[in-house]
């Protein structure tokens, strides 16, 4: 193999098997895709050691992708339950799965996940460090943190969230500009605490070249984490968030010089009115690198319904340029999601992604909707169920309330506009009060 990473291959004019697969999935000319990868506008996360991967592209002119978070915690340590979630996420065609395990020895679960998953796999090595070394945060060294990154890369992780942007300068901006919710990024807050406790620079920022060495070796895409993402709408688009974003843009250029692929992570919680501006800022400051957003969650008052607040923000964000949506479940801010929560989160996020693809004019995005509309016009319920984003729920709702006229539903019955227009346009009587002829 005479290239190091997907970006290196693209710059050399080499078509990789991963590029071929992505181009086919996206109905895109391979030459266009290669140019987008070469310029960093598209990333194809594909670790050389992830043998079960079905690669996906993330970025400009591609379908909006979704990520599913799962993993074990101290309070919910059940590997089998998390593996069931993996199966469900794959069944529901999530393009990415992030293992956010934050307790104990996580290697067993991570390796099983990578072995069984065709979806691209992401991790946050910072979460793993405390359990991996069985040390308190303050006592972990910079070298040990980098060793965890290499361990995850060697295991086959396709992309890693690394919070390189919360350096000393960004930390000072944060301290000078108090927030209502401080820092809500788990990995970012751990790094900030490590820096404060040890009076040292962020090791991932200070040793960024060593991070690049590891990622180049295994072709790991760096998902540059946003430690300063807003955790409430009051804190959005503030000096800390913007200072970190500028730093991420600078690190992006350094990574691209080494042919390491980059994804930028973004907010977070913010008002609907700020979403477009934030998408434009990221694309400008980070040189059109792919943008990966958590939500954005557009109101802070809906615990139990944050899959909805997130889907609203995600649809708008993706329509204005976000490329990758992290799902949010109804359990957000409340507890570890169960498999039912996960399904609700996936469906909500897939709806947001698809709605955005229609708005962006992604080729073929409207075809799905047009097929559904034709089935509705024809009152073809079997085809409607086949095309539904959640066939199981659609079938269950219809079965719960059977209409007199099997072609309609119990909302309108024989006053169904579709039924009656079909009949009238065919020159037939609509017969609302009596049996059809």
Curated annotation (Swiss-Prot):
Cofactor binding, note field: Binds 1 [4Fe-4S] cluster per subunit. The cluster is coordinated with 3 cysteines and an exchangeable S-adenosyl-L-methionine.
Protein's UniProt name: Phosphomethylpyrimidine synthase
Swiss-Prot/TrEMBL catalytic activity: 5-amino-1-(5-phospho-beta-D-ribosyl)imidazole + S-adenosyl-L-methionine = 4-amino-2-methyl-5-(phosphooxymethyl)pyrimidine + CO + 5'-deoxyadenosine + formate + L-methionine + 3 H(+)
Binding-site positions, substrate: 69, 98, 127, 163, 185-187, 226-229, 265, 292
Cofactor (UniProt): [4Fe-4S] cluster
Family: Belongs to the ThiC family.
InterPro entries on file: ThiC, ThiC/Bza_core_dom, ThiC/BzaA/B
Role, per record: Catalyzes the synthesis of the hydroxymethylpyrimidine phosphate (HMP-P) moiety of thiamine from aminoimidazole ribotide (AIR) in a radical S-adenosyl-L-methionine (SAM)-dependent reaction.
Pfam families for this protein: ThiC_Rad_SAM
Pathway this chain belongs to: Cofactor biosynthesis; thiamine diphosphate biosynthesis
EC number per UniProt: 4.1.99.17
Taxonomy of the source species: Bacteria, Bacillati, Bacillota, Clostridia, Eubacteriales
Entry keywords, A to Z: 4Fe-4S, Iron, Iron-sulfur, Lyase, Metal-binding, S-adenosyl-L-methionine, Thiamine biosynthesis, Zinc
A cellular component annotation (GO) from this entry: cytosol
Gene: thiC
Organism superkingdom: Bacteria
Record-listed Zn(2+) binding positions: 269, 333
Amino acids binding [4Fe-4S] cluster: 409, 412, 416
HAMAP family with a match to the protein in the record: ThiC
UniProt record, GO biological process: thiamine biosynthetic process; thiamine diphosphate biosynthetic process
């Amino acid at each position: 193999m005479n290239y190091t990473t997907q970006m290196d291959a693209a710059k050399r004019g080499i078509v990789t098997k991963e590029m071929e697969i992505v181009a086919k999935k996206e109905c895109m000319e391979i030459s266009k895709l290669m140019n987008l990868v070469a310029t960093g506008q598209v990333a194809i996360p594909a670790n050389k050691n992830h043998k079960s991967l079905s690669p996906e592209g993330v970025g400009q002119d591609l379908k909006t992708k979704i990520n599913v978070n799962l993993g074990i915690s101290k309070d919910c340590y059940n590997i089998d339950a998390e593996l069931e979630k993996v199966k469900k996420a794959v069944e529901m065609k999530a393009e990415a799965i992030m293992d956010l395990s934050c307790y104990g020895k996580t290697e067993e679960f991570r390796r099983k996940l990578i072995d069984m998953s065709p979806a691209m796999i992401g991790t946050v090595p910072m979460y793993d460090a405390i359990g991996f070394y069985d040390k308190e945060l303050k006592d972990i060294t910079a070298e040990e943190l980098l060793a965890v990154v290499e361990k995850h890369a060697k295991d086959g992780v396709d992309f890693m969230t690394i919070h390189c942007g919360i350096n000393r300068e960004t930390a000072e901006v944060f301290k000078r500009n108090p927030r209502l919710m401080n820092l809500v990024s788990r990995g970012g807050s751990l790094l900030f605490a490590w820096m404060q406790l040890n009076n040292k620079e962020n090791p991932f920022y200070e040793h960024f070249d060593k991070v690049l060495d590891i990622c180049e070796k295994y072709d790991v895409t760096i998902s540059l984490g946003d430690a300063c993402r807003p955790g409430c709408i009051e804190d959005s688009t503030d000096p800390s968030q913007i200072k970190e974003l500028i730093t991420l843009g600078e690190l992006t250029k350094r990574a691209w010089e080494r042919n390491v692929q980059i994804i930028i992570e973004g907010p977070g919680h913010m008002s609907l009115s700020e979403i477009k501006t934030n998408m434009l800022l990221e694309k400008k400051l980070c040189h059109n690198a792919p943008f990966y957003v958590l939500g954005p969650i557009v109101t802070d008052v809906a615990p139990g319904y944050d899959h909805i607040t997130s889907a609203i923000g995600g649809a708008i964000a993706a329509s204005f340029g976000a490329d990758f949506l992290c799902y949010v479940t109804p359990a957000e801010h409340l507890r570890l999601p169960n498999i039912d929560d996960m399904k609700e989160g996936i469906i909500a996020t897939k709806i947001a992604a698809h709605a955005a693809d229609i708005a962006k004019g992604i080729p073929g995005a409207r075809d799905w909707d047009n097929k559904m509309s034709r089935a509705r016009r024809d009152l073809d319920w079997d085809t409607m169920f086949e095309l539904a984003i959640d066939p199981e729920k659609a079938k269950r709702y219809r079965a719960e309330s059977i209409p007199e006229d099997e072609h309609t539903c119990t909302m309108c019955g024989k006053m169904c506009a579709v039924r009656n227009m079909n009949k009238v346009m065919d020159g037939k009587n609509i017969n609302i009060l009596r049996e059809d002829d």
